[in-house]
Amino acid sequence: TDMPIQVILRKHEGGFVSDRCLRASDLNENLGEKNNPEWKTIVYDNKSKSFVAPNGSIGFRWGEEGKWNLLHQSGGQEIDQELSCLGNQDELVSVGFPHFTPNESDLLWRNVPVRKVKNAKNEEMYVTSVFDLQVANYGIDRGLGGENVAQSYSDSSVAYTPAWAEKITGVKAADIERTGREFADNA
């Protein structure tokens, strides 16, 4: 899964927006990766408490026989890929997510937990996981507060709730909730 992969955030309009995946080539000495470091995505390892290049990214496809796989390893060591840094974050920042509803803001700002890391130029960067970005984009309140977080399914003022969708589509919020639960039950 891509969920633990770290994404660089860049400053935008007083907050941040997602930029691209953090790569070994972004970090000091390519994080020890000599072959294709610009194609090796990075995760945070709970065991070593550090950023690592896990087996399986496209950078391992050529030139490193046996490392293009889905084993939870980096450098021959077992790793535990962190899904979310929530609770261990360095900071909470406001991240803007694209929003395409007419007559509403182009960006929805939501709080996201982040880690700070120094790049190869010794500049501080903010990074977070794909998972943390996706959950924030959905508007799920994980106790982080901030703008655009629904208090309930019936909150029609926050994008993507059933009540909000009912205003746009005409489909009853209760039907949207039921359909969502049925999909979840069958997943």
Predicted regions and their residues:
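Long, well-ordered, tryptophan-enriched scaffold segments
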Residues: 1-186
